[in-house]
Amino acid sequence: PLMRMAAQAAAHMAAGMLDDEDLALEDTSIVLLAGAGDNGGDGLFAAAALAQEGANVTAIAVGRSLHEAGFASFVRAGGKVLVLDPAADIPGCASGFSAGEAGERLQTAIAVARKSHLIIDAMTGIGIQGSLRGIPAALASALGLDGEAPDEPALPNRESSGDFPLVLAVD
């Protein structure tokens, strides 16, 4: 129940952010940066709700797995998944690809995220210790983030920016 409530709140916030920009969900491209833990599960359930409302949602899996129930809900809602880790074990998704293909997938993920209207960051939660490492760090750095754990939770200021992509952190 707690995860579903967090996901509903995140989906509501995301829809509100897009509405503030005069964008209908069915006209938007949303990227979810999804980690393997419960924070990633929150993001997957939120992304599933947005996909059910007509948004074009792509989840970028930054780890070797995804929250099982969140992943199932997201796929049922029509969400697409891009796996970055060659050692990933995510049902129905490619794995075991070469280092060269992993680099190409990372570049694709960066391009897709940069072209989106909204990025939902659910890579890690409040339990992270230290800075991001590996694929999450590379992705965060490429998207203009510093890769360090935030001093406080990131919450949108609800002011219209006109700049895309907007970012919503699921903490």
Give a label for each model feature.
Residues 23-170:
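Glycine-rich phosphate/dinucleotide-binding loop and adjoining beta-alpha-beta core of small-molecule
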Residues 1-33:
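An N-terminal, well-structured beta->alpha segment
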